[in-house]
Design a protein with these regions (language model features):
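Long, contiguous binding/interaction regions
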Residues: 1-204
Length: 204
């Protein structure tokens, strides 16, 4: 805060949180040879997160929020940040080395819907789409969700967002899809016979 890397109204995670979220780090190498590192979103990521948002095309934002957002304000991010506890609600970011520094190029989140169900959502920068990044994120989020008592994911997806529907279909063979106007509600029960080691995304 003294160096203004985070705002005065941002509170850092408690020390016990910082200890266990270290286990939530992972990496992957894309088919194009790019190394992506994944970790939980932190308050100090605000500027990078906002830069990520403004780097996205309108269609990508619309697919995520179902309406167009022109401004991504400090207050909007604080509202999102206030719900993150790294257990019932969490956001993971993917970072890639760009022009000498790391940039956020993806974010995946889950939020509590009920005691056993968490709603999941993703955004991936256009030049990093179709590289398996959302699939890696959902695998990592499932590991964390299982550790915190969840038994399934849900998602609301626009009917023409075929790429996201493919990600869910590929991972969850027993997923159910319910069409409601322009949206599809997806329910994705976790397979009960899998171990955490089986579903853990690859790490370097």
């Amino acid at each position: 805060k003294k160096r203004h890397y985070i705002f005065a109204d941002q509170l850092p995670p408690a020390s016990e949180d910082l200890l266990f979220i270290e286990d939530y780090r992972s990496t992957m190498v894309t088919a194009k040879g790019k190394t992506i590192s994944f970790r939980p979103l932190l308050p100090s990521d605000e500027f990078a997160y906002r830069n990520f948002f403004y780097s996205l095309k309108e269609k990508t934002i619309y697919y995520r929020y179902f309406y167009n957002i022109k401004l991504f304000t400090h207050e909007m991010l604080q509202e999102q940040w206030a719900s993150i506890d790294y257990r019932s609600n969490i956001s993971l970011i993917g970072l890639s080395q760009e022009k000498g520094h790391k940039e956020i190029m993806a974010i995946g989140s889950y939020a509590k819907e009920s005691e056993r169900v968490a709603e999941v959502a993703f955004m991936v920068r256009e030049d990093y789409q179709n590289l398996g990044i959302a699939s890696h994120l959902i695998a990592q989020l499932e590991v964390i969700a299982r550790q915190n008592g969840y038994e399934q994911f849900s998602a609301a997806v626009l009917i023409d967002n075929r790429a996201m529907l493919r990600v869910f279909t590929k991972r969850y063979a027993n997923a159910t899809f319910t069409e409601d106007g322009h949206e599809i509600r997806v329910v994705m029960p976790f397979e009960k016979n899998l171990t955490l080691e089986t579903i853990q995304p690859a790490s370097a």
